[in-house]
């Protein structure tokens, strides 16, 4: 008999993965944490029953949440990552030569520990001399730092449990205050197929605070619907108007200058909702 893990998206839809082995499981002070070795996607991080990342397709998410905003800013030096305890976002941020310091604030240190042990391909980001790790509340940390960062990346779990406040209007206002005059921020904003209303709410909240708001997307097989959105709030620079020659090349597997531009092209079913 085979072992299966099932992630329930709603009452009518679920995704199941055949599992080779349960590598790790624990209940932390904040959430249930598991690392599974799945047949289709290899080692997979699961928090509160929801797949966060896998070693097979993690590069898509981590490249798109980082390189799009980093290549939008003309000279990003200070970067804040809220969440991102697996280390993948930190790994990509530190590839940029202009970045002098990347601070990662993670509320659950057990996520970092498990990632270092079972997901070293991602957690190698913690080894960068540019990296600073703070164990604590990202909302509080942002509120305590005014005009400090060129880029804030909200690499959060879904809007449940400890991550609920990371999707709030008050938090977006706090991020605006934490950014320098040319700063911008990006957040993962869920599935266009299953969370359209949430995406629209987040977009409108951000557009009410920042001069520029843009939503873009990427194909990520392990996420529900395999299509995932990200939303940017920018004080000055438009991520959808970055000239190809301005996009800095890095060792990537998904992100390219062409993908950067194409990611802002909305399918009609989604574009119609933004009108």
From Swiss-Prot:
EC number annotated for this UniProt entry: 2.5.1.16
Pathway stated in the Swiss-Prot or TrEMBL entry: Amine and polyamine biosynthesis; spermidine biosynthesis; spermidine from putrescine: step 1/1
Residue numbers binding spermidine: 62, 86, 155-158
A single GO molecular function term of this UniProt record: spermidine synthase activity
Any Pfam family the entry gives: Spermine_synt_N
Reactions the enzyme catalyzes: S-adenosyl 3-(methylsulfanyl)propylamine + putrescine = S-methyl-5'-thioadenosine + spermidine + H(+)
Active site: 155 (proton acceptor)
Subunit structure comment from the entry: Homodimer or homotetramer.
Name of this chain's protein: Polyamine aminopropyltransferase
Annotated source species: Desulforudis audaxviator (strain MP104C)
């Amino acid at each position: 008999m085979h072992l299966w893990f099932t992630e329930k998206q709603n009452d009518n839809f679920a995704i199941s993965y055949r599992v080779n082995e349960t590598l790790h499981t624990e209940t932390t002070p904040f959430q249930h944490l598991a690392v599974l070795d799945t047949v289709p996607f290899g080692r997979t991080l699961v928090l509160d029953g929801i797949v966060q990342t896998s070693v097979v397709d993690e590069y898509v998410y981590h490249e798109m949440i980082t390189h799009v905003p980093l290549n939008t800013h003309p000279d990003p030096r200070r970067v804040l990552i809220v969440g991102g305890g697996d280390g993948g976002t930190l790994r990509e941020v530190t590839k940029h030569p202009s970045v002098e310091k990347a601070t990662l604030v993670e509320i659950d240190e057990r996520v970092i520990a498990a990632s270092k042990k079972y997901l070293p391909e991602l957690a190698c980001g913690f080894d960068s001399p540019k990296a600073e790790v703070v164990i604590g509340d990202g909302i509080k940390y942002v509120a305590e730092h005014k005009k400090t960062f060129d880029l804030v990346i909200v690499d959060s779990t879904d809007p449940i449990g400890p991550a609920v406040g990371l999707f709030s209007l008050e938090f977006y206002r706090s991020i605006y205050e934490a950014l320098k005059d040319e700063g911008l921020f990006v957040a993962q904003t869920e599935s266009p197929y299953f969370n359209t209303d949430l995406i629209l709410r987040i977009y409108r909240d951000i557009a009410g605070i920042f001069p520029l708001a843009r939503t873009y997307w990427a194909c990520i097989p392990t996420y529900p619907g395999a299509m995932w959105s990200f939303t940017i709030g920018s004080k000055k620079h438009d991520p959808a108007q970055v000239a190809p020659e301005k996009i800095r090349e890095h060792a990537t597997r998904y992100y390219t200058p062409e993908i950067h531009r194409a990611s802002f092209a909305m399918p009609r079913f989604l574009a119609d909702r933004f009108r």
